[in-house]
Structures are given as C-alpha cells and as structure tokens.
C-alpha cells in the first residue's frame, strides 16, 4: 500500500525544499506547459514573502495594489480594508505595483502536490490553474452520510472510511446487498454509503439514496470509483433489483469520486427505482421496504 500523505488545503501554501537558491527571473513565462524539474532551484523565501498578501496570506495575482509608501495588497482584500493600507493606514488609491507583477510573471514554482507525485514546474500565473486540475491533487472523502472535510490519497481515504465512518469493506467483484427499512415513508431525502468494494486492485463505493424526482419519491443506487475519471472509464458495472417475478437491471460506468455523490444523483446516473415499485418488489403489504440489490463490476478489455 502506498504511503499516506495528507494535505490540509485550509492553510496557506508553504514550499520548503531541502536547499534554497534564487531562481533566474530574466525570462518571462507565459506557457502553461510544465517545465522539466530543476533540482534545488526554487524561489527564495524572501521573494515568496514579497508576493504574500499581508491580510489573507495568500499569493497575490494581478492587479497587485500598493499604497504611496510601497506596501502591497491583493485585489481581493482591498475592499475588505476600506481602501486603507493595513500596514501604515494610508489611503490606497488605485496604484498598481507593476514591478512586482512582472517579477511574479518571471517565476517558476513546483506544484504544491509534489508530495503526491507531481513533478511539474509551472510559471507563477499558471500554477493555480494547474493545481485546480492536477491529477495528483488529493481526493475529498467520498462518504455521503455527512459533510466530511477530510482529503487525502486513496489508501488514506480507504482507511479513513473504514476506521472513522465504519463503512463495510468487501473483497470481490460481485455483491448482494439487502436494504431494509421498517417505515420507508419517513425517508424523503436520505443518503447511505453501503459498502466499499476492493477488486482489480481498485476501490469502488456503493451508494443508495432516497430523494424526490419531481413529485415522486424514488431510490437511486450507483457506484463511484475511488480514482480519476480517466481510470474509471476502464470499468463497468451492473445493478439488479427485483422481486415477485420482476426485475430491473442497470448497466453503466462508475463515476469518479472527483464528482460528488450529489452530482451523480442529480444527473440520475444510476439505477432509479420509484418507491411504489420498490415496495412492490418487497412483497407483503408494501409497508416495509425489503430491497435486495445485486451487482457486478468488470474491467473493460
């Protein structure tokens, strides 16, 4: 299992390499394509501090504002300080620090997800866009029963789901899950993460939700892939539900956990069962939900 790495995106970014040298800033960079890594060549801490907003402590991007005394501020924080310099309290006006903007344009920085495996070096003004799409960026916790803010790589999240959310773990590519609810009419909007499956060396999450589709109460079951969307397309799955001699079958491609469970649900990308049909499948007097969901995961050739 790969080593666990955890990133807390709520704090400010820190780049702390083993050896620090000043980067050559004589070349303006406008190409978003990553450059080959340059060992031990990074922006000095003093330059990074110059580009740090004194209010939000984030990296500054054009327009970078300055007061008459030369103190700088990012454009996002300017309205928050009511046009007063947070350092000297002088009026800010509309002075831009063009020199600092040009210095920033000439810098190259490593992706903040380098500890996850990204080796690219990016121009300063392209770095944020890359990081928002970086294939090595951490995944958000896929647990759908509550709003969980944990993020990390896949091995970390698997352990987190097992230990912290007590999600059932299952080895194998076929499954047979029975869902029972004594009073299904009480459940209008609810979500459950039933099981995490391990097969083909990958992990898949089975979700089951109750929600309103227009005026009709329905259930939806779907599978999400614990990995990137490109990898998810290598797999397919089927879900089957039925009873009293009838059955419904769904076949599809698992969605990546990059897509939230709400996004998958709202796109109706799964097996949808109307509550009346689910109660019919349950048999009896249709007062208790007893729904058996079976399924299979396979790898496309």
From Swiss-Prot:
Subunit structure: Homodimer. Interacts with NEK6. Interacts with SKIPA.
Zinc finger (RING-type): 53-89
E.C. no: 2.3.2.27
Keyword Zinc annotated: yes
Family label: Belongs to the SINA (Seven in absentia) family.
Gene Ontology biological process terms from the UniProt entry: negative regulation of response to water deprivation; protein ubiquitination; ubiquitin-dependent protein catabolic process
Record protein name field: E3 ubiquitin-protein ligase DIS1
First-listed, main subcellular location of the protein, grouped into a coarse class: nucleus
Class in the EC hierarchy, top level: transferase
Domain notes: The RING-type zinc finger domain is essential for ubiquitin ligase activity. The SBD domain (substrate-binding domain) mediates the homodimerization and the interaction with substrate proteins. It is related to the TRAF family.
UniProt entry keywords in alphabetical sequence: Cytoplasm, Metal-binding, Nucleus, Stress response, Transferase, Ubl conjugation pathway, Zinc, Zinc-finger
Subcellular location, record wording: Nucleus; Cytoplasm
Gene Ontology molecular-function annotations: ubiquitin protein ligase activity; zinc ion binding
Pathway: Protein modification; protein ubiquitination
Highest taxon, organism lineage: Eukaryota
Reaction(s) this enzyme catalyzes, per UniProt: S-ubiquitinyl-[E2 ubiquitin-conjugating enzyme]-L-cysteine + [acceptor protein]-L-lysine = [E2 ubiquitin-conjugating enzyme]-L-cysteine + N(6)-ubiquitinyl-[acceptor protein]-L-lysine
Induction: Induced by drought stress.
UniProt function note: E3 ubiquitin-protein ligase that mediates ubiquitination and subsequent proteasomal degradation of target proteins. E3 ubiquitin ligases accept ubiquitin from an E2 ubiquitin-conjugating enzyme in the form of a thioester and then directly transfers the ubiquitin to targeted substrates. Plays a negative role in drought stress tolerance through transcriptional and post-translational regulation of diverse stress-related genes. Interacts with the serine/threonine-protein kinase NEK6 and promotes its degradation via the 26S proteasome-dependent pathway.
InterPro entries named among the record's database cross-references: 7-in-absentia-prot_TRAF-dom, E3_ubiquitin-ligase_SINA, Sina-like_RING, TRAF-like, Znf_RING, Znf_RING/FYVE/PHD, Znf_SIAH
SIAH-type ZnF: 106-166
UniProt-listed Pfam families: Sina_RING, Sina_TRAF, Sina_ZnF
GO CC entries: cytoplasm; nucleus
Other noteworthy facts: Plants overexpressing DIS1 exhibit reduced drought tolerance. Plants silencing DIS1 show enhanced drought tolerance.
